[in-house]
Amino acid sequence: MIEKLQVIEEKYLELEKKISDPEIISQPQEWQKLMKEHSNLQPIVEKFREYKRILDTIKEAEELLDTDLDEDFEKLVKEELNRAKEQKEIVETQLKILLLPKDPNDEKNVIMEIRAGAGGEEAALFAAELFRMYSRYAERKNWKVEVMSTSESDLDGFKEVIFMISGKGAYSRLKYESGVHRVQRVPVTESGGRIHTSTATVAVLPEVEDVEVEIREEDLEIDTFRAGGAGGQHVNKTESAVRIVHKPTGIVVTCQDERSQHANRDRAMKILRARLYDYYQSIQQKEIESQRRSQVGTGDRSERIRTYNFPQGRVTDHRIGLTLYKLEQILDGELDEIIDALITHFQTERLKEIG
Protein backbone atom coordinates (compact mmCIF):
# COMPACT_ATOMS: atom_id res chain seq x y z
CA MET A 1 0.00 0.00 0.00
CA ILE A 2 2.83 2.42 0.90
CA GLU A 3 4.43 2.02 -2.54
CA LYS A 4 1.11 2.72 -4.24
CA LEU A 5 0.63 5.84 -2.10
CA GLN A 6 4.14 7.08 -2.90
CA VAL A 7 3.41 6.78 -6.62
CA ILE A 8 0.16 8.75 -6.12
CA GLU A 9 2.01 11.48 -4.19
CA GLU A 10 4.64 11.77 -6.95
CA LYS A 11 1.87 12.07 -9.55
CA TYR A 12 0.18 14.74 -7.39
CA LEU A 13 3.41 16.80 -7.16
CA GLU A 14 3.88 16.49 -10.91
CA LEU A 15 0.32 17.76 -11.47
CA GLU A 16 0.97 20.63 -9.04
CA LYS A 17 3.83 21.82 -11.24
CA LYS A 18 1.79 21.46 -14.42
CA ILE A 19 -1.23 23.45 -13.20
CA SER A 20 0.96 26.41 -12.31
CA ASP A 21 2.76 26.29 -15.68
CA PRO A 22 1.75 29.41 -17.74
CA GLU A 23 1.75 27.35 -20.93
CA ILE A 24 -0.84 24.91 -19.50
CA ILE A 25 -2.87 27.76 -17.95
CA SER A 26 -3.23 29.23 -21.45
CA GLN A 27 -5.03 26.00 -22.53
CA PRO A 28 -8.29 26.10 -20.50
CA GLN A 29 -9.48 22.58 -21.43
CA GLU A 30 -6.18 20.90 -20.61
CA TRP A 31 -5.79 22.96 -17.41
CA GLN A 32 -9.32 22.01 -16.28
CA LYS A 33 -8.63 18.31 -16.92
CA LEU A 34 -5.40 18.45 -14.86
CA MET A 35 -7.13 20.44 -12.09
CA LYS A 36 -9.81 17.74 -11.83
CA GLU A 37 -7.17 15.01 -11.63
CA HIS A 38 -5.28 17.05 -8.99
CA SER A 39 -8.38 17.56 -6.83
CA ASN A 40 -9.26 13.83 -7.10
CA LEU A 41 -5.82 12.89 -5.70
CA GLN A 42 -5.75 15.60 -3.02
CA PRO A 43 -7.74 13.76 -0.28
CA ILE A 44 -5.53 10.65 -0.69
CA VAL A 45 -2.29 12.66 -0.57
CA GLU A 46 -3.39 14.68 2.47
CA LYS A 47 -4.37 11.48 4.32
CA PHE A 48 -1.05 9.82 3.31
CA ARG A 49 0.88 12.81 4.69
CA GLU A 50 -1.06 12.54 7.95
CA TYR A 51 -0.17 8.82 8.01
CA LYS A 52 3.55 9.59 7.53
CA ARG A 53 3.43 12.11 10.41
CA ILE A 54 1.94 9.41 12.66
CA LEU A 55 4.69 6.95 11.64
CA ASP A 56 7.30 9.60 12.53
CA THR A 57 5.66 10.11 15.94
CA ILE A 58 5.72 6.33 16.60
CA LYS A 59 9.38 6.09 15.56
CA GLU A 60 10.41 9.04 17.77
CA ALA A 61 8.49 7.66 20.77
CA GLU A 62 10.04 4.20 20.36
CA GLU A 63 13.53 5.71 20.09
CA LEU A 64 12.92 7.76 23.24
CA LEU A 65 11.80 4.67 25.14
CA ASP A 66 15.15 3.05 24.30
CA THR A 67 16.92 5.76 26.31
CA ASP A 68 17.02 6.36 30.08
CA LEU A 69 13.91 8.33 31.04
CA ASP A 70 12.51 9.29 34.40
CA GLU A 71 9.30 7.50 35.36
CA ASP A 72 6.86 10.38 34.70
CA PHE A 73 8.30 11.23 31.30
CA GLU A 74 8.37 7.55 30.28
CA LYS A 75 4.69 7.29 31.19
CA LEU A 76 3.88 10.32 28.99
CA VAL A 77 5.86 8.90 26.05
CA LYS A 78 4.09 5.52 26.36
CA GLU A 79 0.69 7.26 26.36
CA GLU A 80 1.64 9.21 23.25
CA LEU A 81 2.88 6.02 21.57
CA ASN A 82 -0.39 4.18 22.30
CA ARG A 83 -2.42 7.12 20.98
CA ALA A 84 -0.33 7.23 17.80
CA LYS A 85 -0.71 3.46 17.25
CA GLU A 86 -4.49 3.72 17.60
CA GLN A 87 -4.53 6.66 15.20
CA LYS A 88 -2.34 4.72 12.74
CA GLU A 89 -4.96 1.94 12.52
CA ILE A 90 -7.78 4.44 11.92
CA VAL A 91 -5.87 6.31 9.21
CA GLU A 92 -4.80 3.02 7.56
CA THR A 93 -8.48 2.05 7.16
CA GLN A 94 -9.31 5.52 5.83
CA LEU A 95 -6.51 5.20 3.28
CA LYS A 96 -7.73 1.77 2.16
CA ILE A 97 -11.20 3.26 1.63
CA LEU A 98 -9.77 6.19 -0.34
CA LEU A 99 -7.91 3.70 -2.55
CA LEU A 100 -11.06 1.72 -3.37
CA PRO A 101 -12.00 1.92 -7.08
CA LYS A 102 -14.38 4.83 -7.60
CA ASP A 103 -17.92 4.28 -8.86
CA PRO A 104 -17.78 5.96 -12.30
CA ASN A 105 -21.27 7.36 -11.72
CA ASP A 106 -20.53 9.05 -8.38
CA GLU A 107 -20.08 12.57 -9.74
CA LYS A 108 -23.21 12.42 -11.90
CA ASN A 109 -26.57 14.11 -11.43
CA VAL A 110 -29.44 11.78 -10.53
CA ILE A 111 -32.90 11.05 -11.82
CA MET A 112 -35.09 9.88 -8.94
CA GLU A 113 -38.41 8.10 -9.36
CA ILE A 114 -40.79 7.73 -6.42
CA ARG A 115 -43.88 5.54 -6.82
CA ALA A 116 -46.68 4.95 -4.33
CA GLY A 117 -46.81 1.25 -3.41
CA ALA A 118 -49.18 -0.64 -1.12
CA GLY A 119 -51.60 1.59 0.77
CA GLY A 120 -53.57 3.55 -1.83
CA GLU A 121 -54.06 7.26 -1.05
CA GLU A 122 -51.92 7.03 2.10
CA ALA A 123 -49.01 5.62 0.04
CA ALA A 124 -49.38 8.52 -2.43
CA LEU A 125 -49.22 11.04 0.46
CA PHE A 126 -46.09 9.28 1.76
CA ALA A 127 -44.53 9.43 -1.75
CA ALA A 128 -45.12 13.21 -1.70
CA GLU A 129 -43.41 13.45 1.73
CA LEU A 130 -40.39 11.52 0.42
CA PHE A 131 -40.22 13.90 -2.56
CA ARG A 132 -40.24 16.85 -0.13
CA MET A 133 -37.55 15.15 2.01
CA TYR A 134 -35.18 14.74 -0.96
CA SER A 135 -35.95 18.29 -2.18
CA ARG A 136 -35.08 19.71 1.25
CA TYR A 137 -31.89 17.59 1.34
CA ALA A 138 -30.94 18.96 -2.10
CA GLU A 139 -31.53 22.52 -0.82
CA ARG A 140 -29.16 21.89 2.09
CA LYS A 141 -26.51 20.70 -0.39
CA ASN A 142 -27.09 23.63 -2.78
CA TRP A 143 -28.23 21.17 -5.46
CA LYS A 144 -30.90 21.96 -8.03
CA VAL A 145 -34.21 20.05 -8.21
CA GLU A 146 -36.15 19.84 -11.48
CA VAL A 147 -39.49 18.00 -11.62
CA MET A 148 -39.70 15.98 -14.83
CA SER A 149 -43.02 14.15 -14.56
CA THR A 150 -45.82 13.80 -11.99
CA SER A 151 -49.03 11.84 -11.54
CA GLU A 152 -51.04 13.28 -8.64
CA SER A 153 -53.57 11.55 -6.39
CA ASP A 154 -56.91 13.01 -5.21
CA LEU A 155 -55.48 14.29 -1.91
CA ASP A 156 -52.43 16.00 -3.49
CA GLY A 157 -50.16 13.02 -3.00
CA PHE A 158 -48.10 11.49 -5.82
CA LYS A 159 -48.92 8.19 -7.50
CA GLU A 160 -45.58 8.82 -9.23
CA VAL A 161 -43.06 11.66 -9.32
CA ILE A 162 -39.88 11.75 -11.42
CA PHE A 163 -37.34 14.50 -10.81
CA MET A 164 -33.71 15.34 -11.43
CA ILE A 165 -31.25 16.47 -8.76
CA SER A 166 -28.18 18.23 -10.18
CA GLY A 167 -25.07 18.98 -8.16
CA LYS A 168 -21.58 17.82 -7.24
CA GLY A 169 -21.60 14.22 -6.00
CA ALA A 170 -25.42 13.90 -6.07
CA TYR A 171 -25.33 10.24 -7.15
CA SER A 172 -22.60 9.31 -4.65
CA ARG A 173 -24.84 10.49 -1.77
CA LEU A 174 -28.27 9.39 -3.04
CA LYS A 175 -27.57 6.01 -4.67
CA TYR A 176 -28.27 4.14 -1.41
CA GLU A 177 -31.89 5.44 -1.36
CA SER A 178 -33.05 2.84 -3.94
CA GLY A 179 -35.56 0.39 -2.53
CA VAL A 180 -38.85 0.14 -0.66
CA HIS A 181 -39.53 2.79 2.00
CA ARG A 182 -42.23 1.91 4.54
CA VAL A 183 -44.37 4.23 6.67
CA GLN A 184 -46.29 3.27 9.82
CA ARG A 185 -48.88 5.76 11.09
CA VAL A 186 -52.58 6.58 11.49
CA PRO A 187 -53.64 7.74 8.00
CA VAL A 188 -55.61 10.96 7.48
CA THR A 189 -58.15 8.78 5.66
CA GLU A 190 -58.62 6.52 8.72
CA SER A 191 -61.34 7.47 11.21
CA GLY A 192 -60.72 4.58 13.62
CA GLY A 193 -57.27 5.77 14.66
CA ARG A 194 -55.56 2.47 13.73
CA ILE A 195 -51.94 2.40 12.59
CA HIS A 196 -51.52 1.39 8.95
CA THR A 197 -48.44 0.38 6.98
CA SER A 198 -47.93 1.83 3.50
CA THR A 199 -44.99 1.77 1.12
CA ALA A 200 -43.35 3.78 -1.64
CA THR A 201 -40.61 2.63 -3.99
CA VAL A 202 -37.62 4.85 -4.75
CA ALA A 203 -35.38 4.35 -7.79
CA VAL A 204 -32.14 6.34 -8.14
CA LEU A 205 -30.60 6.48 -11.62
CA PRO A 206 -27.46 8.35 -12.70
CA GLU A 207 -28.09 10.91 -15.44
CA VAL A 208 -26.72 9.51 -18.67
CA GLU A 209 -25.01 11.32 -21.54
CA ASP A 210 -26.18 10.59 -25.10
CA VAL A 211 -22.91 8.79 -25.87
CA GLU A 212 -23.26 6.34 -22.96
CA VAL A 213 -26.41 4.60 -24.22
CA GLU A 214 -27.18 3.95 -27.86
CA ILE A 215 -30.88 4.32 -28.66
CA ARG A 216 -31.87 3.45 -32.21
CA GLU A 217 -34.84 5.33 -33.67
CA GLU A 218 -36.30 2.08 -35.09
CA ASP A 219 -36.45 0.63 -31.55
CA LEU A 220 -38.83 3.38 -30.42
CA GLU A 221 -42.60 3.62 -30.65
CA ILE A 222 -43.63 7.23 -30.03
CA ASP A 223 -47.26 8.25 -29.42
CA THR A 224 -48.67 11.70 -28.70
CA PHE A 225 -51.90 12.46 -26.85
CA ARG A 226 -53.64 15.29 -25.04
CA ALA A 227 -52.33 16.04 -21.57
CA GLY A 228 -54.84 16.37 -18.74
CA GLY A 229 -54.35 17.75 -15.24
CA ALA A 230 -55.65 16.20 -12.01
CA GLY A 231 -59.44 15.94 -12.09
CA GLY A 232 -59.49 17.12 -15.69
CA GLN A 233 -58.10 20.58 -14.92
CA HIS A 234 -55.85 22.48 -17.35
CA VAL A 235 -56.68 20.08 -20.17
CA ASN A 236 -54.41 20.73 -23.11
CA LYS A 237 -56.13 21.34 -26.45
CA THR A 238 -53.12 20.09 -28.45
CA GLU A 239 -51.46 16.68 -28.40
CA SER A 240 -48.46 17.79 -26.34
CA ALA A 241 -48.08 14.69 -24.13
CA VAL A 242 -45.62 12.03 -25.28
CA ARG A 243 -45.39 8.29 -24.62
CA ILE A 244 -42.26 6.44 -25.71
CA VAL A 245 -41.98 2.65 -25.76
CA HIS A 246 -38.53 1.08 -26.13
CA LYS A 247 -39.51 -2.10 -27.98
CA PRO A 248 -36.48 -4.33 -27.18
CA THR A 249 -36.87 -3.89 -23.38
CA GLY A 250 -40.55 -2.92 -23.08
CA ILE A 251 -39.62 0.18 -21.03
CA VAL A 252 -42.36 2.83 -21.26
CA VAL A 253 -41.91 6.54 -20.44
CA THR A 254 -44.72 9.12 -20.43
CA CYS A 255 -44.23 12.89 -20.10
CA GLN A 256 -46.99 15.48 -20.10
CA ASP A 257 -45.91 18.23 -17.69
CA GLU A 258 -44.34 20.52 -20.30
CA ARG A 259 -46.42 22.78 -22.57
CA SER A 260 -44.90 21.65 -25.88
CA GLN A 261 -44.61 18.22 -27.45
CA HIS A 262 -40.93 18.88 -28.21
CA ALA A 263 -40.11 19.63 -24.53
CA ASN A 264 -42.03 16.55 -23.34
CA ARG A 265 -40.19 14.38 -25.88
CA ASP A 266 -36.81 15.71 -24.68
CA ARG A 267 -37.69 14.94 -21.07
CA ALA A 268 -39.04 11.49 -21.92
CA MET A 269 -35.82 10.67 -23.81
CA LYS A 270 -33.70 11.81 -20.84
CA ILE A 271 -35.68 9.51 -18.50
CA LEU A 272 -35.56 6.63 -21.02
CA ARG A 273 -31.79 7.00 -21.39
CA ALA A 274 -31.31 6.80 -17.61
CA ARG A 275 -33.66 3.79 -17.29
CA LEU A 276 -31.93 1.92 -20.12
CA TYR A 277 -28.50 2.58 -18.63
CA ASP A 278 -29.80 1.29 -15.29
CA TYR A 279 -31.42 -1.72 -17.00
CA TYR A 280 -28.20 -2.77 -18.78
CA GLN A 281 -26.11 -2.09 -15.68
CA SER A 282 -28.39 -4.22 -13.51
CA ILE A 283 -28.08 -7.14 -15.97
CA GLN A 284 -24.30 -6.80 -15.75
CA GLN A 285 -24.50 -6.49 -11.96
CA LYS A 286 -26.63 -9.65 -11.69
CA GLU A 287 -23.98 -11.60 -13.58
CA ILE A 288 -21.31 -10.33 -11.17
CA GLU A 289 -23.55 -10.94 -8.15
CA SER A 290 -24.25 -14.53 -9.18
CA GLN A 291 -20.50 -15.15 -8.98
CA ARG A 292 -20.33 -13.45 -5.58
CA ARG A 293 -22.92 -14.29 -2.97
CA SER A 294 -23.23 -11.04 -1.04
CA GLN A 295 -26.55 -9.80 -2.34
CA VAL A 296 -27.71 -7.94 0.78
CA GLY A 297 -28.36 -4.21 0.84
CA THR A 298 -27.19 -3.24 -2.61
CA GLY A 299 -30.19 -1.08 -3.48
CA ASP A 300 -32.44 -3.80 -4.93
CA ARG A 301 -35.77 -2.10 -5.69
CA SER A 302 -37.79 -4.94 -4.17
CA GLU A 303 -35.91 -4.76 -0.89
CA ARG A 304 -37.46 -3.01 2.12
CA ILE A 305 -34.71 -0.66 3.17
CA ARG A 306 -36.20 1.79 5.67
CA THR A 307 -39.17 2.27 8.00
CA TYR A 308 -40.57 5.64 9.11
CA ASN A 309 -42.61 5.05 12.29
CA PHE A 310 -44.67 8.14 13.18
CA PRO A 311 -46.10 7.10 16.61
CA GLN A 312 -42.55 6.49 17.90
CA GLY A 313 -40.89 9.32 15.91
CA ARG A 314 -38.45 6.66 14.69
CA VAL A 315 -36.60 5.96 11.45
CA THR A 316 -34.89 2.56 11.03
CA ASP A 317 -32.59 1.62 8.16
CA HIS A 318 -32.85 -2.17 8.00
CA ARG A 319 -29.69 -2.72 5.93
CA ILE A 320 -27.39 -1.50 8.69
CA GLY A 321 -29.67 -1.78 11.74
CA LEU A 322 -29.50 1.98 12.36
CA THR A 323 -32.37 3.52 14.36
CA LEU A 324 -32.71 7.27 14.89
CA TYR A 325 -35.46 9.00 16.87
CA LYS A 326 -35.35 12.03 14.57
CA LEU A 327 -38.30 11.44 12.25
CA GLU A 328 -39.24 15.12 11.84
CA GLN A 329 -35.67 16.26 11.14
CA ILE A 330 -35.09 13.42 8.64
CA LEU A 331 -38.31 14.17 6.74
CA ASP A 332 -37.15 17.80 6.68
CA GLY A 333 -34.06 16.73 4.74
CA GLU A 334 -31.52 16.02 7.51
CA LEU A 335 -30.32 12.83 5.83
CA ASP A 336 -26.54 13.09 6.26
CA GLU A 337 -26.37 10.98 9.44
CA ILE A 338 -28.08 8.04 7.68
CA ILE A 339 -26.23 8.50 4.38
CA ASP A 340 -22.79 8.77 6.07
CA ALA A 341 -23.49 5.56 8.02
CA LEU A 342 -24.56 3.77 4.81
CA ILE A 343 -21.46 4.93 2.92
CA THR A 344 -19.17 3.75 5.76
CA HIS A 345 -20.98 0.38 5.91
CA PHE A 346 -20.81 -0.34 2.18
CA GLN A 347 -17.19 0.84 1.89
CA THR A 348 -16.25 -1.52 4.75
CA GLU A 349 -18.09 -4.36 2.97
CA ARG A 350 -16.10 -3.65 -0.20
CA LEU A 351 -12.84 -3.71 1.77
CA LYS A 352 -13.78 -7.16 3.12
CA GLU A 353 -14.55 -8.40 -0.40
CA ILE A 354 -11.20 -7.17 -1.70
CA GLY A 355 -9.67 -8.93 1.29
Curated annotation (Swiss-Prot):
It is found in: Cytoplasm. Methylated by PrmC. Methylation increases the termination efficiency of RF1. GO terms for cellular component: cytoplasm. The modification N5-methylglutamine is found at residue 233. InterPro entries: PCRF, Pep_chain_release_fac_I, Pep_chain_release_fac_I_sf, Prokaryotic/Mito_RF, RF-1. Belongs to the prokaryotic/mitochondrial release factor family. Peptide chain release factor 1 directs the termination of translation in response to the peptide chain termination codons UAG and UAA. This is Peptide chain release factor 1.
